[in-house]
Amino acid sequence: MGMRRGRRLAVDVGDARIGVASCDPDGILATPVETVPGRDVPAAHRRLKQLVEEYEPIEVVLGLPRSLKGGEGPAAVKVRAFAQELARVIAPVPVRLMDERMTTVTASQGLRASGVKSKKGRSVIDQAAAVIILQQALESERVSGKAPGEGVEVVI
């Protein structure tokens, strides 16, 4: 089936901050969009809905945190719940979950290497993690010809 045309948004859900990234319609380059405050979840969903209306993505990909062994802990449960509600809020735009085992680690190492100071750097790190999630999603689709990760069912 090859690569579907169209923009995507990727979301890195953290406790305090939510990093957002997007890509061009050809799915070649993933770029940071913004960091959404994460503590007020309904407000975060509203802001993400506005971004979906603005960017008109064909799908939104969320990073699903797993342990290195592939198990799911409390963080994954939280992301699944967030994804479920987001899917309802932005329907009919599909939401997908992508394994993000290493992304935040990779993002913070990359930024540390480039000299980003931590407090201000945190929101940059969230966006960088979202960029990496999106790059992995695009790469996975390029290689497999299938939509990345797993779909989130909309429960009405």
Curated annotation (Swiss-Prot):
Sorted UniProt keywords: Cytoplasm, Hydrolase, Nuclease, Ribosome biogenesis
Listed GO biological process terms: rRNA 5'-end processing
E.C. no: 3.1.-.-
Subcellular localization: Cytoplasm
Pfam families, per database record: RuvX
Domain of life according to the entry: Bacteria
HAMAP family in the cross-refs: Nuclease_YqgF
UniProt protein name: Putative pre-16S rRNA nuclease
Organism the protein comes from: Streptomyces avermitilis (strain ATCC 31267 / DSM 46492 / JCM 5070 / NBRC 14893 / NCIMB 12804 / NRRL 8165 / MA-4680)
